[in-house]
Regions:
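Sec-dependent signal peptide recognition
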Residues: 2-8
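C-terminal motif of bacterial Sec signal peptides marking the signal peptidase cleavage site
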Residues: 14-15
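Acidic/polar, glycine-enriched structural segments that form the non-catalytic walls/loops
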Residues: 18-365, 384, 394-402, 527
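Active-site core of glycosidic bond-cleaving carbohydrate-active enzymes
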Residues: 63, 67-68, 83, 367-403, ...
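Catalytic cores of secreted or luminal carbohydrate-active enzymes
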Residues: 122-152, 521, 659-700
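Short, glycine/acidic-rich hinge or "gate" loops at secondary-structure transitions
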Residues: 350-357, 477-487, 528-533
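Acidic/histidine-rich catalytic neighborhood
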Residues: 471-522
Length: 702
């Protein structure tokens, strides 16, 4: 399958290219956007990784000052497999957090929510929200004398070479020049570093206990009695440590070149002290003891360079260097950095958390309504294998998703909102009532097929269309009085609305219409007949509700949409109905354009999220307003801030937000390559002569 996807991707790169005289200089494009850091700035940390594992460093090139960065972009060491649960001595069970609701679907529904009243149900809910949580696998940094402060690190010259996946860090410490190179292996959870200094410092390996916090660096340094780090084996050039945290264990394999001595400084704290002025080491994290051969720094560096050069040369690119609009340079920077960040943070064997593999948000769990924002772009930018790798996870948790649908009285499978690799549904007073994650798998599988229309892929993805569609049909309610289908009993993507009083949210209606059509088309592709009942649903879905001013409402029941700030804050999901999704029979183009203009002028933009700007831009592009599309992507708002490292800053809690990066890439692909029915090259950019965007390999949206 991998070889088939690769071959067709190469064909697509040749076919899906903007008109231009010569090939884009990809090396120049990538390297001119390499981030550079010249100060100990807690929001400017840099990362290396491979989608399964990531390691984030401060200005020293290692994790020397984690406390300084704790409230910025933390110095994380995280993986897809590294999870931990606190003990459950009370033997709480998931079903104890279930609460019965009646949303007039004709049956009772059980939801994993958050009871307010003290008692066992609330305790069970709290336990399953916190557990399991993602681990910080360990701090690897310079071991400095106690009196050394971050301000003592001077003359900082640090850069991330994205073409090769290596961080180069130069600085002076007490007048001693340091040069540290940091790299990650592309297929192992392993970092490698090379240190050059006249009087080299030691390397610390300091291991925390988890906090179980909602949003933090996952490092509790005050609980050494609750975990242990033992030296399992050691020789002149390597050592293996075993980590034990309650029922969780993992292994840390350290190897080095040259003379060095490993000592245990204190509980869960080891120091490796070299004697040579040039010193290299590697450190690998594994869930079980590893028998894999030990690698040198040079071998890891070579593997990294080959991996990243393949990534940049085999995928799609967009070059803004011939644009004369002053905003183009910044847009290109955001695009290239987002391509790098999403490959290291959001391309693993499980869906990514919103803060990737950098630090914990929502306890390190991932949100399935966000996977479209994180990963749809991989199908559009020529990295089908990265999207396909994650989608395989859905098959492993399908039995749990089926149980959720069954306990709520629906057919098919209902994907959980907030979860972990096991698929356990985390209780939530909001998330458990969302439904817009249900069509994502249909959409993402469709993007894979459009980029690689093979028989093998059709067979592989058939069930990914059928079973979610069965739930979607079952969830819709037929109203005989009005001869229509409605969607109700859900919190929409605009989460300021309430499940019990919301009927026909606009984005969900449009998404139901699109996904059910795709599901029917997929049946025909695979030699199956269309489901007649599904066609009736498609035909009789309620059109989007609007007011007397011909503005679309946040829901049919939200009649005060334009009078109540609750309805004009958070996600302007109505724009996603035409933007993320194509125009359909439920929508009047003129009314949607009116709605875009009102939102542009009046929305509570200070209460938005990073993906709201790409969503607005996609709507503007489809509505024939390319200047608004560009302006939305670069709107000067806090939650549309992109840091020096490319991360999308939101606020003091979410200092990085990868759905914003993913949305940016999806939108730029659409603005360049277009969408079904668009005309010409770069249809989402203004035709004022200032946006000569050159691109290669991008795919259009439906």
């Amino acid at each position: 399958m991998k070889h088939t996807i690769y071959a067709l991707t190469m064909f697509a790169l040749a076919a899906c290219t903007s008109p231009q005289e010569e090939a884009i200089d990809r090396h120049a494009l990538v390297t001119r956007n390499n981030p550079e850091v010249t100060a100990m700035d807690s929001l400017s940390s840099l990362s290396v990784g491979n989608g399964e594992f990531a390691y984030t460093v401060d200005a020293t090139g290692l994790q020397t000052f984690p406390e300084v960065y704790k409230n910025g972009v933390p110095l994380g060491t995280q993986s897809q497999w590294g999870w931990h649960s606190f003990g459950n001595p009370e033997n709480y069970k998931p079903e104890e957090a279930l609460v019965e609701y009646d949303f007039s679907h004709g049956h009772k529904e059980l939801y994993a929510t958050q009871p307010k009243e003290p008692g066992r149900a609330k305790e069970a809910s709290d336990w399953y929200r916190v557990n399991p949580h993602r681990l910080h696998l360990g701090i690897i940094g310079l071991e400095l004398e106690n009196e050394v402060r971050p301000s003592d690190v001077q003359n900082i010259q640090q850069s991330l070479d994205m073409w090769n996946g290596i961080i180069n860090s130069r600085f002076t410490l007490k007048e001693t020049p340091y040069h540290i190179q940091t790299v990650c292996h592309p297929e192992r959870d392993m970092i490698a570093a090379r240190l050059s200094a006249r009087q080299p410092a030691g390397i610390k390996f300091h291991f925390p206990y988890p906090t179980g916090g909602h949003c933090d660096d996952a490092c509790n340094w005050e609980a050494n009695d609750k975990h242990s780090t033992t030296l399992v084996s050691e020789d002149a050039q390597s050592a293996v440590l075993k980590r034990t945290l309650d029922a969780t264990t993992y292994y840390v394999t350290i190897s080095w070149e040259g003379a060095a001595k490993l000592r245990e400084k204190s509980a869960n704290y080891f120091v490796l002290t070299p004697t040579d002025s040039v010193f290299t080491f590697t450190c690998q994290f594994t869930p079980q003891a590893s028998a894999a051969p030990i690698l040198t720094f040079a071998e890891v560096q070579q593997a990294s360079s080959g991996h990243w050069q393949n990534y940049w040369t085999q995928g799609a690119v967009a070059d803004f260097s011939q644009c004369t609009d002053v905003r183009a340079k910044e847009l290109e920077r955001r695009v290239v950095l987002s391509q790098y960040l999403l490959a290291i943070q959001c391309a693993g064997s499980t869906p990514p958390q919103e803060t990737g593999l950098t630090y914990n948000s929502w306890f390190g769990k991932f949100h399935l309504e966000m996977i479209w924002w994180h990963q749809a772009q991989f199908a559009l930018w020529g990295h089908l294998e990265l999207l396909d790798r994650t989608l395989s996870w859905y098959e492993t948790v399908e039995p749990i998703a089926r149980q959720i649908a069954e306990r709520q009285g629906f057919k098919g499978i209902r994907w959980m909102k907030m979860t972990d690799p096991s698929g356990t549904e985390a209780p939530s007073k909001v998330g458990s009532f969302l439904i817009w994650q249900q069509p994502h798998l249909i959409y993402l599988a469709e993007l894979l097929y459009r980029a690689n229309p093979s028989e093998e892929l059709k067979k592989k993805k058939k069930n990914k269309k059928k079973k979610p569609a069965e739930f979607m049909y079952s969830f819709a309610t037929y109203e005989e009085e009005h001869d229509r289908y409605v969607l109700k009993g859900a919190i929409p993507a605009q989460e300021t609305l309430r499940a019990a009083e919301t009927v026909n949210p606009p984005f969900e209606l449009s998404y139901w219409h699109f996904a059910m059509q795709v599901a029917q088309t997929w049946r025909e592709r695979t030699g199956m007949e269309r489901v007649p009942e599904w066609d009736v649903l498609i035909e009789k879905l309620s059109p989007l509700a609007y007011n007397d001013e011909q503005l679309y409402l946040a829901a049919e029941t939200a009649v005060d949409t334009y009078k109540d700030i609750r309805f004009t804050s958070d996600h302007m999901a109505v724009l996603g109905a035409v933007g993320i999704l194509p125009m359909n029979q439920l929508i009047h183009a003129g009314y949607m354009k009116n709605t875009l203009h009102w939102i542009w002028d009046n929305w509570n933009w200070d209460k938005t999220w990073g993906w709201d700007y790409p969503m607005t831009a996609m709507n503007a592009a489809r509505m024939g307003e390319p200047e608004k599309a560009v302006s939305a992507l670069l709107m000067d708002k806090r939650t549309n801030t992109y840091l020096v490292n490319g991360h999308n800053y939101q606020d003091g809690r979410l200092r990085i937000y990868l759905p914003g990066n993913g949305g940016l890439l999806t939108t730029v692909a659409m603005m360049c390559a277009g969408w079904d029915g668009s005309e010409g090259n770069n249809p989402g950019f203004p035709k004022d002569g200032k946006w000569n965007v050159r691109w290669e390999g991008l795919q259009p949206l439906p």
